[in-house]
Amino acid sequence: MKLHMSKTYFLKKLIPSLTLFPVLTSYASSNKDVIESPQSKRYTIESIKQYISLFIGECVFISGQEATQDDSFFYSGYFVSIPVIADELIDNVIYIRGKNCTWKRKIDDFIDVSWFGAIGDGINDDSNAISRANIAAHNECLPLKFIPGHIYQVKNTYEIDVSKTSWFSSDLSTLKWFNDFNADFAIRLFSSQKDYSKRFQNVKVAIKSIAIIGAGIKNLLDSCAIKIGGDERNSSLFTIDSVSIQGWRTTLAFDNNSWRIKFCDCHFLWGNIIAPPGNKNSGECMVFDNCMFADNRSYTELHYGDWFFSKCSFDNHEVKLFGDANVFINQSHMENPGRKTTDFTIVSINSINSFASVIDSFIFISPTPKIINTPLFYVISDNENGLYVRNLRFQATENYNPSKGTENALVLVGGDGKSYLENVRVSLNNKSYLALNKNDSSVLMNSRFKDGLRYWDFNDGVSLQARISSNDSETIVFSKNGASLSQSVLVKSTGILSGGMMLKIVSGDLKLTLECYDSLDNNITTREWNCSASDYSDWSWVRFGEKLPDNIRKIKFYCKSFGQSVDVKLSTILMDIIS
């Protein structure tokens, strides 16, 4: 019997079926990528090893512990079946061996140290858990995440290949090393990326919001907290952000091939930063932004490179330059918060090829039990690159007096190297009577008498005493009543004429006179200081200064001795005009 079906009837039956077909096909295909029912797809780590996966891409939820493992912690999560991989990659955290596949943890954008058993309670040892997590982060090329507020007690060293992974916390996490840790470093940052065209892989935050803690201020760990660079060629272009380091003899140590690295919002407490001599391919454009360096007579020692410090705080911390290092400090705060020793220097240039600049910054010397007898800045002899200081505000009390030290002058800059200071504002016990440079006076000529008495007017009661050794200063001797020494100079700016000189009076008296003249050679003001043997029986710094009139054109400075028996010695007469 033949069945007769009209064309219209056939199409009515066929079209709904065709419409439904792609929907069913799509649903079946999508099931390979998403979980159908978490409740029906739950396994323990033991049972999943016996389960036969239905297809590659099947998603299940795995919980429970691996009872046969020494490290029995397991962090539950979703896993997807993938083809079988090498045994050495099976870690029972990211990868689990299945019956006919490998189960891989479903990961969004990071590896969590908790997956590997890191507890972070400040008591249990999380060393190995973090090591395993770090290996997984490198293998997966994903960041390693730490839990905010947790304290991870550790004893291992860790290496972070920045081209593959990074460490971070969404807030602040702490890694605390055991007190008996004695390896060379706690963490090494480097990049294994050799391909120039792929160097962009380094452009990331290598460590963020992690405190790296050693021991206490009186028992620092001798290891280095973070070592950067090594034999790899391109450890560069990455950032360290919001990292606090304390309790280490060395907070940072730079090795070969470390360059173009930025530190921002970091805290370096009690320890030193070292860029040692001999490093290769290192030191180009190193940046510290809004960082703090503090306490324990710590220092930053740099032997090469270009180093930029912006909006930083240096508390009881010295920056030491050697080799051909260049340092640029701006908009920063430098402070001695209460040092108990007599030495305190902020920046010292200790080689003839180094250079430093300090601009738009503030220096504060708080009252201390000791008189600080070193200058705030130092430039070694024969350095022609020198020190440049501009827009500096300096505030101190009488506890700052380098004239009582080896510089024999109350100055901001010591040493005999080149320095240039512009727009320096000084508050020293509400007086601004100190000089800027030991090496030079911005007002007087031949102020240290290196050229004898050239540029000075004097009579026969004044003579130049021969130096006993090359280390001695040139000394002027007044030997009779009425002996005088003077110099007239033109001045081009107003402000405070500030300075002083070293003086010793065995007998007699000495009067110092400062006269100011306008452009018509009219005397505007006169200021005098009387010095006697009772106050200056031994070498001491005489402070003098005067607020200059607005219409000043010239000054004349006199030194004149009085008395029946005169034995007066002076050296290093320094004058600067400061704000």
UniProtKB/Swiss-Prot annotation:
This is Uncharacterized 65.4 kDa protein in cps region.
